[in-house]
């Protein structure tokens, strides 16, 4: 048995946890540079605010409808996600972090001691008590069915946030799959939905009843696996440890367009520094660094330019100094004057779990002495808050930094911003 825990309106809910005055108030969270709506509380949804709606359209409604608006506070959301994970891990045999607001839980053995539905309510109540966040829980014999059950928690409020699909309630499974559009099935995207609809497969139940050999021949083994999962055959196991990453990308759209190379150099240094930090977090070394820059594709009255350059490293490294230097060399290859750049980024690839390699006799770059100790010290200094110690090349408070004009405090990651309790 599997359970899928999904935090309701996660970003908006995190903002409400530390602001009790916002209870039952409409709250929205904006994307990078305060561009568009990426999260809505139920009250905001009721006002007709759409996911992805541009901020300038919502701005007109803000005062009239008394909507509370926040810029994305990723440090807060990540911290709250980790807290939810910690609660679930303390109560469950094994947990897989599927996304920042979704976690799969292995219930093997649990159902012998307690009803899955009762256990789901216990999980829900404990998370609410310890974090202040409300979640829905879908329980089923496969991960795909658990996803469908979780979808049902939002459609069937009478179940109080927990829907269990077990062998004892087969009729509930059939009813749910008959109501769920095939496009809502886990792993079925828009294009696949169109093809299935053309064949008369419009619901999850119709997909479950499809011939597996036909699905495999005309679609893929992956969709065949989905069909088997919908029929209660578990084909997808729990991933307690995420698979090793093949690449790491760190990029942002700029708050202000960049036209000066020095400013672009600062941005690339910052992105390379962050990418190197992530690389060390993965306990990997890289042998390839890519820097890319681009103008806005929507600025039709401005010249358009996009380019990327790759730097190969003779020795695998996780040292920020090597990665920053390589990223800046790549920038020199792609930089062109006369453009208004809106985005840049650094990508690391060609990973190896070890930095050991045989240097060539005539290699200009030799292994750095005490590199790992220095990087470990740097990461420990920055552990309680990113950016305590940084490389001078990234500058201080640059104008191109991402706009977050309505950013909430970092309640859980900065000592100076911990909320004060009053009695």
What does each model-identified segment do?
Residues 1-228, 237, 365-423:
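Gly/Gly-Pro- and Ser/Thr-rich, intrinsically disordered tail segments characteristic of DNA damage-repair
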Residues 184, 194-340, 356:
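DNA-contacting surface of Y-family translesion DNA polymerases
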Residues 103-109, 308-314, 358-363:
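Short, hydrophobic beta-strand segments
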Residues 322, 328-384, 389:
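C-terminal hydrophobic structural anchor segments
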Residues 98-102, 140-143, 284-288, 339-343:
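Short Gly/Ser/Thr- and Asp/Glu-enriched loop/turn motifs at secondary-structure junctions
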Residues 10, 33-36, 296-299, 351-355:
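Short, charged/polar surface micro-motifs in flexible loops or helix N-caps
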Residues 111-114, 156, 300, 352-359:
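Short, charged/polar, Gly/Pro-enriched secondary-structure boundary elements
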């Amino acid at each position: 048995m599997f359970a899928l825990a999904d935090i309701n309106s996660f970003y908006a809910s995190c903002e409400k946890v530390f602001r009790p005055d916002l209870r039952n108030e409409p709250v929205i969270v904006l994307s990078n540079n305060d561009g568009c709506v990426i999260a809505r509380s139920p009250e905001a949804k009721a006002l007709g605010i759409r996911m992805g709606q541009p901020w300038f359209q919502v701005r007109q409604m803000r005062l009239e409808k008394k909507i509370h608006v926040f810029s994305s506070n990723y440090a807060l959301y990540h911290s709250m996600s980790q807290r939810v994970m910690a609660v679930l891990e303390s109560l469950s045999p094994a947990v897989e972090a599927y996304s920042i607001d979704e976690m799969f839980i292995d219930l093997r053995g649990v159902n012998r001691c307690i009803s899955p539905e009762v256990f789901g309510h216990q999980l829900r109540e404990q998370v609410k008590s310890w974090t202040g966040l409300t979640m829905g829980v879908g329980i089923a014999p496969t991960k795909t069915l658990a996803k469908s059950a979780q979808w049902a928690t939002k459609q069937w409020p009478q179940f109080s946030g927990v829907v269990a699909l077990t062998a004892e309630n087969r009729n509930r499974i059939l009813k749910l799959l008959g109501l769920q559009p095939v496009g809502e099935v886990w792993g079925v995207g828009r294009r696949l939905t169109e093809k299935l609809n053309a064949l008369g497969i419009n619901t999850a139940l119709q997909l479950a009843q499809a011939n597996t050999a036909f699905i495999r021949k005309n679609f893929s083994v992956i969709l065949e696996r989905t069909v088997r999962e919908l029929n209660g055959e578990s084909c997808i196991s729990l991933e307690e440890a995420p698979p090793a990453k093949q690449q790491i990308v760190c990029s942002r759209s700029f708050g202000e367009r960049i036209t000066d190379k020095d400013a672009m150099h600062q941005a690339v240094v910052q992105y390379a520094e962050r990418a190197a930090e992530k690389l060390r977090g993965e306990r990997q070394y890289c042998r390839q660094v890519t820097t890319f820059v681009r103008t806005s594709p929507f600025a039709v009255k401005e010249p358009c330019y996009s380019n990327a350059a790759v730097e190969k490293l003779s020795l695998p490294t996780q040292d920020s100094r090597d990665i920053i230097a390589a990223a800046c060399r790549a920038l020199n290859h792609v930089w062109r004057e006369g453009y208004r750049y809106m985005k840049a980024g650094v990508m690391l690839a060609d990973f190896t779990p070890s930095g050991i390699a045989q240097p060539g006799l005539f290699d200009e770059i030799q292994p750095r002495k005490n590199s790992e100790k220095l990087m470990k010290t740097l990461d420990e200094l920055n552990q309680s808050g990113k950016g305590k110690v940084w490389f001078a090349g990234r500058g201080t408070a640059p104008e191109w930094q991402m706009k977050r004009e309505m950013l909430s405090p970092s309640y859980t990651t900065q000592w100076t911003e911990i909320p004060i309790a009053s009695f």
